[in-house]
């Protein structure tokens, strides 16, 4: 090779090949969260990422399909990569569940947050509707008590399940995340027990 400096000109290399040791992925969760099949590539990518990879989820969403969010939460918890949730506008409803699963939370100034319970409809015989409502209530209590634990007070989670909406600005969300981190004691063996909170530039 004619290159004599410490820098290597890849255009002059012969019989040399490049292998990436890490990747940075940018995923844009913008607008409504749609059907789960729209996010199959995201889930697969997260599950096959390595500990050297970084995944940015750029959030500007008013929520949507909660079961799609639940599957993404599973993939976020399973991935070996570092997941950064960057809120860049709206983070509401089901989008807040995804946000709170990240390893690092970035919040842009003037972003807007809203936390509330799920919406659904029931049909069928009266007994079937009653059974469905009771099952949904039990499911929602378990989900929100886990997802919002440490971020919302137990009394606030109960109010959400009962129908109250909680609106927050970036400063309020940052304070709650920092308080949750101080209280958190990740179980032994937990890969990433604590979140980092960053104000996006």
Summary of predicted features, one role per range:
Residues 2-41, 61:
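STAS-typified acidic loop motif
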Residues 6-20, 48, 58, 70, ...:
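Catalytic phosphate/metal-binding cores of nucleic-acid and nucleotide-processing enzymes, i.e., regions
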Residues 27, 55, 122-200:
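Charged, glycine-interspersed solvent-exposed loop segments at helix/strand-loop junctions
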Residues 29, 57, 99, 113, ...:
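Terminal peptide-recognition signature
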Residues 39-40, 66-70, 96:
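Conserved strand-to-helix beginnings and helix N-cap segments that scaffold or border functional pockets
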Residues 44-52:
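Short, basic/hydrophobic alpha-helical segments
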Residues 52-68, 82-89:
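Short, glycine-/small-residue-enriched flexible loop/hinge segments at domain edges that mediate gating
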Residues 77-122:
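Glycine-rich beta-to-alpha active-site loop
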């Amino acid at each position: 090779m004619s290159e004599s400096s410490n820098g290597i000109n890849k255009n002059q290399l012969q019989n040399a090949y490049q292998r990436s040791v890490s990747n940075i992925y940018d995923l844009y969760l913008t607008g409504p969260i749609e059907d789960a099949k729209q996010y199959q590539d995201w889930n697969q990518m997260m599950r096959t990422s390595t500990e050297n990879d970084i995944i940015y989820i750029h959030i500007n969403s008013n929520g949507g399909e909660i079961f799609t969010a639940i599957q993404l939460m599973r993939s976020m918890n399973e991935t070996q990569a570092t997941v950064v949730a960057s809120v860049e506008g709206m983070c509401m409803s089901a989008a807040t569940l995804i946000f709170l699963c990240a390893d690092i939370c970035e919040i842009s100034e003037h972003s807007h947050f809203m936390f509330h319970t799920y919406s659904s409809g029931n049909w069928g015989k009266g007994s079937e509707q009653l059974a469905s409502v009771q099952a949904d209530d039990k499911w929602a209590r378990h989900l929100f008590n886990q997802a919002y634990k440490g971020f919302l007070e137990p009394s606030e989670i109960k109010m959400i399940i009962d129908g109250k909406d909680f609106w927050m600005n970036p400063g309020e969300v940052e304070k709650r995340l920092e308080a949750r981190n101080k209280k958190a004691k990740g179980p032994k063996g937990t890969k990433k027990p604590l979140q980092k909170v960053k104000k996006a530039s």
